[in-house]
Amino acid sequence: FLVGNLEYLGLRLDLGYNLVSILSLAGFLMVLYGISYRMFKSFWAGAAAIVFFFFRSGTAFWHYLWEHLQAGDLVRTLEENTAFIGYTTNENWGLWNFNVYLNQRHLAFGLLMAAVAVWTFMDWVEAGCSHKEHGFLWVRNRFFTKKAWICRNVDTAILLGLFLGLTAFWNGAALIGGLLILAGLAVFSDGKLDYVICAGLAVLFSELQSKIFVSGSVMSPSFYWGFLADNKSISGVLWYLVEISGFFFVGMIVAAVFLKRGQRAVLMGCLLPMAFAFLVSLTPDINVNHKYVMISYAFVTVFWGWIVRCVFLAGKNSWKKWAGRAAAA
């Protein structure tokens, strides 16, 4: 609709289409950088997060490289290759590549709205994680105290609920992914009723739009374990996760022990869309769940940006500094 208006006002259709897409993606990356800087106070951590957004971790290329080095036709194969590299189910469709944002231009705009909500609700996370208690006592107080539930800013919650609810018109996966991240943040936040108000309004407006614009059922949720993993055992699913993302997700779970309380709370929220993709199917085609993995991937880059920045600057003497830089590279 917006692109159509731009064309009506005299802008070429392709320019209008690309302009909206570029501004949406640029806006999302700006908010992603803002989330990184807010947590880690480092320009380089935020810059690295943006780089990792475009250049993902994975094992497919290394598998491809080794396979064709052994065959002795690597250079010729790279020159003639016209398809996405992939060894897992439907990976050659480009499920895990940046083209996801090119094929679904509305996804970046939806993620921009979700990222704004995440950035705003980080105030609630900081309030919940700033208490002096530790361990079980702190966890208990996040559920069984007045501060844990009483509203902190109802107006902001209503506004964000409206924004997220209207986002469903552009991309339902971005809305669901955003609400999943907020659910993870809410666990460790004060003012949980604000989250309830925001989520309730978002779901309400999403349902209203579905009734107006769509005939029949929009979703048919069901439990579906394992996503696209061929081996549905726990070890098989973990190995599939390693195949599609390298050490990106599995390594982040290990690295979480070195994060501060508030940072771990945000990380938990960012990982929930990925977990959702491996547990729930909302449509008959499970392939569409790849968007939830991509949403988690986009937000978790913030933490890898910080880790790589720390490794790069590690070491007090010359050889340790260069060792840290080599490890970061």
Predicted regions span which residues?
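Membrane-helix boundary/interfacial segments in multi-pass membrane proteins
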Residues: 9, 93-105, 208-244, 271, ...
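Transmembrane-helix motifs of polytopic, lipid-linked glycan transferases
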Residues: 19-42, 116
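Membrane-interface helix-loop-helix junctions at transmembrane boundaries of multi-pass membrane enzymes
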Residues: 127-155, 189-197, 252-271, 314-323
